[in-house]
Amino acid sequence: MQIIIDHVRHEYAGVAALRIFHDLPGPLKAEKPDRIAGFVPDVYAFDAPLTVRIIGEAKTQADLETAHSQEQIAAFLAFLGQQEHGVFVLAVPWAAKRLAHVLVESKRAAVGAQSVRTTILDDLTLRREC
């Protein structure tokens, strides 16, 4: 999950007032992402005034193949598709990169979220834009 946070900080360094919430263990009362369509994202970021919303998820290859993860990804893409500038970042092991790309593109088409910018991060190349 840290790879997603680092990516967002780097890619959106010029965005004023960017807030990043994450689901990493931390101090009590640390701000965590809110549920979106019943799912809690690993990373949720936005700025003020609102110009971008970013949702990040970290998945293993086995996770990508579960119905839960596929429903979660579809829900996040659908939510972001309703935003003016939605961004979805998915971090996976290098071996799962192709599967992740196919899954994200399939779900993005299924929910009508073609306007959502997507990025697939992996542990070797660190970044691959869809």
What kind of feature is each model-predicted range?
Residues A91-C130:
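Domain-level recognition of nuclease-like catalytic cores that cleave nucleotide substrates
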Residues I55, V89-L90:
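Structural beta-sheet core signal
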Residues H22, A58-T60, V92-A95:
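Structural motif
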Residues G14-T51:
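Active-site metal-binding core of divalent-cation-utilizing nuclease and nuclease-like domains
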Residues M1-I4, A67-F76, A100-E105:
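Well-ordered, non-membrane alpha-helical segments in soluble/globular domains
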Residues M1-R9, A13:
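Nuclease catalytic cores
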